[in-house]
A protein has these predicted regions:
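Cys/His-rich short segments
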Residues: 73-137, 148, 254
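Active-site beta-alpha connecting loops in nucleotide-dependent enzymes
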Residues: 185, 203-277
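Short, basic, glycine/proline-bearing loop/turn elements
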Residues: 18-24, 196-200, 229-235
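Glycine/charged-rich beta-loop-alpha catalytic/anionic-binding loops adjacent to active sites
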Residues: 139-147, 192-197
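A conserved, hydrophobic alpha-helical segment in the catalytic core
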Residues: 6-16, 107-122, 149-180
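Flexible active-site lid/hinge loop adjacent to a nucleotide/diphosphate
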Residues: 2-101
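Short active-site oxyanion
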Residues: 42-47, 198, 253-260
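Gly/charged, well-structured mid-domain segments that form the phosphate/adenylate-handling core
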Residues: 118, 131-133, 164-200, 204
Length: 278
């Protein structure tokens, strides 16, 4: 809302709405209000929304901007029960509890409201045939995408990029080549070696992100050591209460020889693991 008075974007991508560093950003409703104000300031701006996220979809429907959706219309994981914290548990239109035909993680999935009929929209960019073995691979609108990334959430990231590029008229014949040349940012699925030992470094600052990092660990059945470093510097977020919303229970099945905690708030992390008998 501070930037939009100076220029009007042609496109906006809404990826998801998760709680993140509450001491800095506040609750999701504050973020949604800011985004809604921004969208009203650029009424001709085209919005590409993650249709699997009920909050992002509601935000698009509640404004008058032209919009389209991307998402993953088929079930990838078979888990029925989860301890994950879901945002948007209740319909933003009528207040009824949301139901799911299936979900992917957090509140992302094939949702619908039994009260007013609000549901996941049709997907203009639909990721299908998702394969998470040896990197990630999937199809979108007949185009096969293969990338040497880990983490199911990266399917959403790549779908968003593909959809935005398509809407903007960018040629896509070299899309896979561009993905292959991209180097992940520091802490984002970063791979390196220390004395011949392979290391993967992942950053997380909210429950949804940490749960996805744990999911990535769980896809590797080989023996491993896990190190969890928690800080509370201003750039990290000083409130670490969100650790109690992460599903650390799953790490008991991670085939880990050791789990080490460190950082300024290592004792908070140690206590959190104690409560799941780790």
């Amino acid at each position: 809302v501070r930037v939009f008075p100076h220029f009007k974007p042609d496109y906006m991508v809404l990826t998801n709405l998760f709680r993140d560093q509450l001491d800095r950003y506040g609750e999701i409703d504050i973020t949604m209000n800011l985004l809604s104000r921004a969208m009203k300031m650029a009424p001709d701006m085209k919005v590409l929304v993650n249709g699997d996220d009920s909050l992002s979809t509601y935000l698009a429907m509640d404004n008058e901007n032209p919009w389209s959706a991307y998402g993953i219309s088929t079930q990838v994981f078979q888990e029925e029960n989860t301890k994950e914290i879901r945002e948007g548990r209740f319909c933003k239109r009528c207040g009824e509890k949301m139901e799911y035909n299936f979900y992917h993680y957090s509140q992302l999935g094939d949702y619908y409201c039994p009260g007013c009929g609000f549901k996941r929209p049709s997907l203009e960019f639909d990721g299908t045939n998702v394969d998470l073995n040896d990197g990630i691979a999937f199809d979108v609108n007949g185009f096969h995408i293969k990338a040497n990334y880990r983490g199911f959430y990266n399917v959403y990231n790549i779908l968003a990029v593909y959809g935005a590029a398509s809407l903007a008229g960018v040629p896509l014949e070299h899309f896979n080549e561009i993905l292959g040349n991209y180097k992940p940012q520091f802490g984002r699925n970063e791979l390196f070696q220390i004395s011949g030992t392979k290391v993967m470094l992942n950053l997380a600052k909210n429950p949804a992100g940490f749960n996805q990092n744990i999911a990535a660990v769980m896809t590797d059945s080989s023996p491993k050591d896990i190190i969890i470093l928690i800080n509370d510097n201003s750039q990290d977020g000083t409130d670490v209460s969100w650790l109690w919303d992460v599903d650390f229970d799953r790490l008991k099945d991670a085939n880990a020889a050791s789990i080490t905690v460190c950082g300024l708030r290592c004792q908070d992390m140690r206590l959190r693991l104690k409560y799941v008998d780790i």
